[in-house]
A protein has these predicted regions:
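Conserved AAA+/SF3 P-loop NTPase catalytic/coupling segment centered on the Walker-B
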Residues: 22-23, 27-48, 199-224
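Interdomain "pre-motor" coupling segment immediately N-terminal to P-loop NTPase/helicase cores
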Residues: 56-96
């Protein structure tokens, strides 16, 4: 994809590219074009808004793979190519009673003591086993340092087959942190981008009580309905923990 963008930019500014204009006007044939999740941050905003026009202008692509597209890219694709789009998403481990037993066994091995807390964690997660619950399970682990809060989250994530996504909220005290949570420029790191690329369906928001209360507004819809929306992404977290 980035090679295609370089060719596109050279076509816009042939005098600066050093490439003969006749060569730039030739159609390019590509069997497979892959747009990785990190590629969006390497291009200008107009590339996202005109994504379909750019990738189809004088380019013939057999199969276009687009990973975790921002909203503008997805809407551009849906508007022009909706009937030709095949959607594939990550599949996370489905929570069943058997999986709950595994979670409890791992918690027992990984975290010393806290027997009542472990039972309450399992009780909170049980509703996801019905398969009809469209909201995430929100668990508040509260207590002094060293009692096993973070280790419990890591253990649950391990049981569900992936590395824990850990968001360190004690660092969220600047304007850059505000942009990270609510989304700003597509080229910047964001909470939404991190969540859409997570390995497991377990997200730890560490030291949630240490942040400016203004940040809590970003989580009301997530906790209530399982959706997280910022300026670039709209994410379904309905079965997350």
């Amino acid at each position: 994809f980035m090679e295609l963008i370089q060719h596109y930019n050279a076509r816009l500014r042939p005098n600066e590219s050093g490439v003969r204009e006749a060569a730039l006007q030739k159609n390019l044939y590509v069997d497979n074009c892959i747009v990785g999740a990190d590629d969006y941050g390497s291009v200008m905003p107009h590339v996202l808004s005109n994504f379909v026009n750019i990738v189809t202008l004088n380019y013939q692509i057999g199969v276009l793979y687009v990973q975790n597209p921002p909203r503008r890219v997805l809407e551009s694709l849906q508007s022009a190519l909706d009937g030709d789009i095949e959607y594939k998403g990550s599949s996370y481990v489905k929570l069943t009673r058997t999986v709950l037993k595994t979670i409890y066994q791992n918690l027992d091995n990984d975290v010393l003591g806290q027997d009542q807390c472990k039972k309450q964690i399992l009780s909170g997660m049980y509703r996801l086993t019905t398969g009809t619950h469209g909201k995430p399970v929100v668990l508040m682990l509260y207590g002094p340092s060293g009692v096993g809060k973070t280790e419990s989250a890591k253990s649950i994530s391990k049981s569900l087959g992936g590395e824990l996504l850990r968001i360190q909220f004690s660092m969220m005290q600047t304007e850059e942190a505000f942009n990270y949570v609510f989304g700003a420029e597509h080229s910047k790191s964001s909470l939404a981008r991190d969540m859409v690329g997570r390995e497991s369906n377990v997200i730890l928001i560490d030291e949630f009580d240490k942040v400016n209360p203004a940040f809590y507004n970003a989580f009301y819809e997530l906790f209530d309905e399982g959706r997280y929306v910022d300026t670039n992404y709209d994410i379904d977290l309905g079965q997350a923990v």
